[in-house]
Amino acid sequence: ARQGALGDVLANLLDSQGWKVSREFYYNDAGVQIGNLAMSVQVRCRQLQGESLELPENAYHGEYIVSIARDFLDKKPVIPHGGEPIESTGDYGDTDLIRRYSVAYLRNEQDDDLSALGVRFDNFFLESSLYTTGAVQKTVQAIIDAGYTYEADNALWLRTTAFEDLGNGLRDDKDRVMKKSDGTYTYFVPDVAYHLNKFSRGYTKAVNIQGTDHHGTIARVRAGLQAASKTLGVTIPKTFPEYILHKMLSVVKGGEVVKMSKRSGNYVTLRDLVDWAGRDAARFFLVSRKADAEFVFDVDLAKKNSDENPVYYL
């Protein structure tokens, strides 16, 4: 929720000052959690078909998973915003199709939420495309060729500690695994490939709006970019990309904290906030605190038509 509002306000501000701004949404549609998503939908499909089985502990339990499964079985096509239609065959044994269908389904849900808040994007970028185009593999090879990797414990490591300044004195305190013993890449590797792609498209400045749990990513991504740039013969600024890290918000409604968990399926959407408080009030509240500060969205306060509500003074 905060990402959308913070990013949109920052983009509008930069645009008003003469910057040429492009708003890009990076979809994390690859990796372990997406595998869990596909597995969860498959299990729900089998349950809807009458099979008696339980959802695994690492599955997603929300009702939205049932909705995806039901639409998949009904062979309803999904047309992701800015993408090609994905047709369902109803074959829940087709893991790849279920993965693509589920991702597209949730992309639309996210896009509808952002639209309700008045947030727009110029471009949509899929993490999975970095694998299908070979960008991840090429990035890793560029880093290897630059001499910034080594093998230990059956894994490939990036020598992040070789870089003493990764922007404003930032440096990593230990080397990081790039490729695990099972052959899969760690989560920051596609991030490096993505930012190489972005830099190659002519972007001289990139600002990522992410949660504070990504703090450790900054040094790893910048180290990967600096290493790859040696092989590619390009000069990438040490501070590329820049980051604005925000803490998650909690929601209070009726004087009580709304309990939220993506895995259990309990959550509040942006559309909920807009429905409860209105678009303008929601946007104002979401950017009314420093990004890295704890934030409580008091729905009842946001709806008040009195001087207790900060929006009242605008």
Language-model-detected regions and their locations in the chain:
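NTP-dependent nucleotidyl-transfer catalytic core
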Residues: A1-L314
